[in-house]
């Protein structure tokens, strides 16, 4: 004798849902509200911090007479200009998203953020390392730090490294959200 299951469904009565008295509970935090993600207040703060450090490094380098005679310093200036433009554009986009209450959690937009952050982060790191290397060469190996503004070079390299750290944080946050978005 063969046993067969029957397709009949037996409904079960459920108790009515619990009705809480008082104000409704706040919505649960979702991944698209993650601090630091594009379109959030923390994401905007990260962009302006990137812009601030990059602009500081750029202003320090430009204020030094004769910085353009060293290729590494010219590369740092070019990288900081690119970082400033990138951070300013994405900061404006974050402001727009915050003001209009729109989400930037689109995989195409997040891919754009990830690739742009990766490129600018790499350029910023390369420029900061090159400037720091030349500064160490001038200071420690050639012992010609007096007439060559080593303190300013060191400050510009330090600001570039800070901009790199914040851009890298932004890159990893955007990449993580892009991966979990799909």
From Swiss-Prot:
Gene Ontology CC annotation, any one: plasma membrane
Keyword Hydrolase: no
Cytoplasmic-facing ranges: 1-47, 94-117, 180-182
Subcellular compartments: Cell membrane
Superkingdom: Eukaryota
Transmembrane segments: 48-68, 73-93, 118-138, 159-179
Extracellular compartment segments: 69-72, 139-158
Record keyword Transmembrane present: yes
Record keywords: Cell membrane, Membrane, Transmembrane, Transmembrane helix
InterPro entries to which the protein is assigned, alphabetical: CASP_dom, CASPL-5
Chief localization: membrane
Pfam families in the cross-refs: CASP_dom (PF04535)
Membrane topology: Multi-pass membrane protein
Protein family: Belongs to the Casparian strip membrane proteins (CASP) family.
Subunit structure: Homodimer and heterodimers.
Name recorded for this polypeptide: CASP-like protein 5A1
């Amino acid at each position: 004798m063969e046993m067969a299951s029957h397709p009949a469904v037996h409904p079960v009565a459920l108790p009515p849902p619990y009705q809480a008295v008082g104000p409704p509970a706040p919505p649960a935090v979702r991944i698209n509200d993650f601090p630091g993600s594009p379109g959030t207040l923390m994401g905007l703060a990260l962009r302006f911090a990137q812009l601030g450090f990059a602009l500081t490094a750029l202003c320090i380098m430009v204020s030094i007479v004769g910085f353009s005679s060293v290729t590494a310093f010219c590369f740092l200036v070019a990288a900081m200009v690119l970082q400033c433009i990138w951070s300013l554009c994405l900061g404006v986009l974050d402001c727009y998203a915050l003001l209009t209450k729109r989400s930037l959690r689109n995989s195409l937009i997040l891919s754009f953020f990830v690739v742009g952050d990766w490129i600018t982060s790499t350029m910023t790191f390369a420029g900061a390392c090159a400037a720091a290397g030349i500064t160490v060469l001038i200071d420690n190996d050639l012992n010609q730090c007096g007439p060559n503004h080593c303190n300013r070079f060191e400050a510009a390299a330090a600001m570039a490294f800070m901009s790199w750290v914040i851009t890298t944080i932004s890159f990893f946050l955007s990449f993580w959200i892009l991966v979990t978005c799909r």
